[in-house]
């Protein structure tokens, strides 16, 4: 069993994010620690927004050593009138800073973490209510946030300046196609 990376299939994360996670996983990740040794790409919020509507991001709180303290799922994040506004889990309107770190679901995980995912997924399915089952998600940031609260993991945030892009809205597609074309033309991708 080897460390593994989890990403969203419909996102472009950038080259540096992959390099940083790979380097951490192959040179620093320590499976002998008494807690799960996890790493994640910490994107800059302003580099992860859609021009076509609100997005959901995990807002990251970190300590002075860039160890993740909490991931707070935040919804309907949009730039309006030069400000970035969003809704928290209680549906209250909040203002965010453009340079805040966010999770884009790019995680480096030790092999034994699969056991946590499996047992948690069984519990998630057992507790699903049929009336809203189609809208419920088994969110990795919430799982990791729970482990952080229980002091069962240490997560190192690896900051990346890469610009994320993905198709959150159908109107995003032409922008993504053009961005990927540009990456191909310049030899990045």
Name each model feature, range by range.
Residues 62-64, 71-74, 78-189:
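Conserved alpha/beta core of the MobA/IspD/sugar-nucleotide pyrophosphorylase nucleotidyltransferase superfamily
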Residues 4-6:
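Short aromatic/hydrophobic "clamp" motif used to bind/position activated sugar donors
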Residues 9-12:
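The conserved acidic donor/metal-binding loop of glycosyltransferases
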Residues 14-107:
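Conserved core of the sugar-phosphate nucleotidyltransferase
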Residues 1-2, 32:
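Glycine-rich phosphate-binding loop signature in dinucleotide/nucleotide-binding domains
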């Amino acid at each position: 069993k080897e460390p593994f990376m989890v990403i969203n299939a419909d996102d472009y994360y950038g080259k540096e994010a992959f390099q940083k996670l790979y380097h951490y996983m192959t040179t620093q990740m320590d499976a002998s620690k008494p807690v799960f040794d996890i790493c994640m790409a910490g994107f800059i919020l302003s580099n992860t927004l859609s021009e076509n509507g609100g997005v959901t991001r995990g807002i990251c709180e970190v300590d002075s050593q860039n160890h993740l303290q909490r991931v707070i799922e935040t919804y309907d994040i949009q730039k309006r009138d030069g400000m970035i506004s969003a809704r928290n889990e209680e549906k209250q309107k909040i203002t965010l800073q453009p340079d805040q770190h966010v999770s884009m679901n790019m995680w480096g995980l030790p092999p034994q973490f699969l056991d946590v995912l499996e047992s948690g997924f069984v519990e998630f399915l057992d507790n699903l209510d049929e009336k809203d089952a189609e809208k419920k998600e088994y969110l990795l940031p919430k799982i990791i946030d729970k482990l952080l609260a229980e002091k069962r993991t240490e997560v190192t945030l690896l900051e990346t300046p890469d610009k994320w892009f993905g198709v959150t809205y159908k109107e995003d597609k032409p922008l993504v196609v053009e961005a990927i074309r540009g990456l191909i033309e310049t030899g990045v991708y």
